[in-house]
């Protein structure tokens, strides 16, 4: 075991694409964790999606041995944390496992919204934060301006910020020295009962569930009986080790150390992130603070384009859940789309990642219904309140007293030339402006928004109106009552359940008209007229009609009596009327997919 004063636990906080994973690679290379031949780009990002999108999804850890300039040997534990808002809870647990953080800011881009959220969390944990200004070798780099931003926006002294370029290897030694000198050593008591935090877990086909732990007090050894305090389950440890970044098996882990254990656990859902691990025979009296059960925030339906793929989809979702307990799914049946699953996600990025992994790793073609959030329905006649996940399941309006919807607080950074467009977008989405601050050439906006308005296409719209320069971060602030209604779309008088949605009463007409217009453009013409209607309850609020294809039944009448033509036209009219009653409208898959991707022109 390493003495406490020679351990440093730190995480790297950075916005997407500011060079976090590249910096981690350089630190591993410099301390000799891997030889030059073994180095691959972004060692800690294992999934292809992580590498391609330049994001980190799961927390990873690596132990580095570093000999400082004063000749002392130190063990540095690097926690590579996710940077995205959907994984905010995973981030908070990873940060809680450390004593300090490197704040990496791109010298050409400056401070962004996600950086801020994680920095404030780190400050709450009383961490020592070392600012690192990365990419200083870029032609557009402005290190002095970025230093000023760090001081003005975050309130951290940045005069001793380390200037570096992870790609070129500039300033890496300065970063390592700053870690040793400025980040405090962990505290802990080896003789106290075992207390360790479960930081993250993932499924390995050979080892079962691998659990990432940070020891607070006591020690962990192979063969020890441990207990998860929140889950209440006991397990026998069969492996203890750490990542360098290759797996290294150890005899034990002591206070302040970060490593992994395996205990023949088969499902990730048994290991909740943030749980306290203690000794089964000699338990600690109090669990660690801050534990939360992660709840899905955004729901949507996933349906296979080919109905024969249903079993394959079910199996694929099961495999993904092995590695991601925060994702939930249950079977559902839709009259329009057939059999599929209703899935719950932490947020929009989470939904996108799962969708992309299903199509890429499992080769599935999917239709995704419009994402929706969880509404609280307060019922009349003392029925209490129920949670609504799927708009199609909404009970009769007469039984509902009021509907509460989730709200978020959003922080938006935008260059001042795009401010007007962003303010209009937030206003259109029922936003309430809380604060507006000018920092240099950029504006920091604080808005309260209904989550329902954000999940649809807010992020894409924000990026397009600001030419990609705006950054956005949010957290939930609770539920508020809203004037919400269920809007259904009817084609030829029949309700299409997959297109039902809950909207604000004021936005219903515009959204309904848009939906009908889009369906009109996409459904092919039939031999009879097809009405497409958007309705709230029994009231139709928008309508479009697809004209019938006309066959010229009078073509064979040359001259002659007009009554002959009239008779044929009347006969055709009767036939069309009968057709409209009994004919079924064929809605192509493309129409569904396009109607559900409303965001393109809203």
From Swiss-Prot:
Tell me the function of this protein.
Required for accurate and efficient protein synthesis under certain stress conditions. May act as a fidelity factor of the translation reaction, by catalyzing a one-codon backward translocation of tRNAs on improperly translocated ribosomes. Back-translocation proceeds from a post-translocation (POST) complex to a pre-translocation (PRE) complex, thus giving elongation factor G a second chance to translocate the tRNAs correctly. Binds to ribosomes in a GTP-dependent manner.
E.C. number(s) listed in UniProt: 3.6.5.n1
**What HAMAP family does its record include?**
LepA (MF_00071)
Q: Does the keyword Iron apply?
A: no
Stated family: Belongs to the TRAFAC class translation factor GTPase superfamily. Classic translation factor GTPase family. LepA subfamily.
In terms of SUPFAM superfamilies, this protein maps to: EF-G C-terminal domain-like (SSF54980), P-loop containing nucleoside triphosphate hydrolases (SSF52540)
Q: Which PROSITE patterns match?
A: G_TR_1, G_TR_2
One GO BP on record is:
positive regulation of translation
Keywords assigned: Cell inner membrane, Cell membrane, GTP-binding, Hydrolase, Membrane, Nucleotide-binding, Protein biosynthesis
- NCBIfam families found in the cross-reference section: lepA, small_GTP
- Give the tr-type G domain ranges: 5-187
Main enzyme class: hydrolase
Q: What is the source species? A: Zymomonas mobilis subsp. mobilis (strain ATCC 31821 / ZM4 / CP4)
From the Swiss-Prot or TrEMBL record, give the protein name: Elongation factor 4
Q: How does it sit in the membrane?
A: Peripheral membrane protein
InterPro entries per UniProt: EF-4 (IPR006297), EFG_III/V (IPR035647), EFG_V-like (IPR000640), EFTu-like_2 (IPR004161), G_TR_CS (IPR031157), LepA_C_sf (IPR038363), LepA_CTD (IPR013842), LepA_IV (IPR035654)
Which reaction is this enzyme known to catalyze?
Answer: GTP + H2O = GDP + phosphate + H(+)
GO CC annotation terms, alphabetical:
plasma membrane
């Amino acid at each position: 075991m390493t003495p406490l004063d020679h351990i440093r636990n730190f995480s790297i906080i950075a916005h997407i694409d500011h060079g976090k994973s590249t910096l981690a690679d350089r630190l591993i290379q410099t301390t000799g964790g891997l030889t030059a031949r073994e180095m691959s780009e972004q060692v800690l990002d294992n999934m292809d999606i992580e590498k391609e999108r330049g994001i980190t999804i799961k927390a990873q850890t690596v132990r580095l041995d570093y000999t400082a300039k004063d000749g002392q040997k130190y063990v540095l534990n690097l926690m590579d944390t996710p940077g995205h808002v959907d994984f905010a809870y995973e981030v908070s647990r990873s940060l809680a496992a450390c004593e300090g953080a490197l704040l990496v800011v791109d010298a050409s881009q400056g401070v962004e919204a996600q950086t801020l959220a994680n920095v404030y969390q780190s400050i709450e944990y009383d961490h020592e934060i070392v600012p690192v200004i990365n990419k200083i070798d870029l032609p557009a780099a402005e290190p002095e301006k970025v230093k000023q931003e760090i001081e003005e926006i975050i309130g951290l002294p940045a005069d001793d910020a380390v200037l570096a370029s992870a790609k070129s290897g500039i300033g890496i030694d300065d970063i390592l020295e700053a870690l040793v000198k400025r980040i405090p050593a962990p505290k802990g008591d080896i003789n106290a009962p075992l207390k360790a935090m479960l930081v993250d877990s993932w499924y390995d086909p050979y080892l079962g569930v691998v659990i990432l732990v940070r020891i607070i007090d006591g020690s962990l050894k192979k063969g020890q009986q441990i207990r998860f305090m929140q889950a209440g389950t006991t397990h026998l440890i069969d492996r203890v080790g750490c990542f360098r970044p290759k797996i290294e098996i150890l005899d034990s882990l002591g206070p302040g150390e970060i490593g992994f254990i395996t205990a023949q656990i088969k499902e990730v859902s048994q290991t909740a992130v943030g749980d306290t691990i203690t000794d089964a025979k000699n338990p600690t009296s109090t669990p660690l603070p801050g534990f939360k059960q992660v709840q899905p925030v955004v729901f949507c339906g996933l349906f296979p384009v080919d109905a024969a793929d249903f079993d394959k989809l079910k199996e694929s979702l099961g495999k993904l859940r092995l590695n991601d307990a925060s994702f939930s799914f249950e079977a559902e049946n839709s009259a329009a789309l057939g059999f599929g699953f209703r899935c719950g996600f932490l947020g929009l990025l989470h939904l996108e990642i799962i969708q992309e992994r299903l199509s890429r790793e499992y080769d599935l073609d999917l239709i995704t219904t419009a994402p929706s959030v969880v509404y609280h329905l307060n019922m009349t006649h003392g029925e209490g309140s129920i949670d609504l996940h799927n708009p199609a399941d909404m009970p009769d309006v007469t039984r509902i007293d009021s509907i509460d919807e989730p709200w978020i607080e959003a922080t938006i950074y935008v260059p001042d030339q795009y401010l007007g467009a962003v303010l209009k977008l937030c206003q259109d989405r029922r936003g309430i402006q809380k604060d507006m601050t000018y920092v240099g050439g950029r504006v920091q906006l604080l808005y309260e928004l209904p989550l329902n308005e954000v999940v649809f296409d807010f992020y894409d719209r924000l990026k397009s109106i600001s030419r990609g320069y705006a950054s956005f971060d949010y957290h939930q602030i609770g539920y508020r009552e809203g004037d919400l209604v269920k809007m259904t779309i009817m084609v030829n008088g029949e309700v299409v359940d997959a297109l039902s949605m809950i909207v604000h009463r004021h936005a219903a007409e515009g959204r309904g008209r848009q939906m009908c217009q889009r369906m009109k453009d996409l459904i092919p013409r039939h031999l009879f007229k097809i009405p497409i209607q958007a309705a709230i309850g029994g009231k139709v609020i928008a309508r479009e009609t697809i004209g019938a294809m006309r066959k010229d039944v009078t073509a064979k009448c040359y001259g002659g009596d007009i009554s002959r033509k009239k008779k044929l036209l009347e006969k055709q009219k009767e036939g069309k009327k009968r057709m409209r009653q009994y004919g079924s409208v064929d809605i192509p898959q493309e129409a569904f997919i396009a109607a559900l991707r409303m965001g393109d022109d809203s």
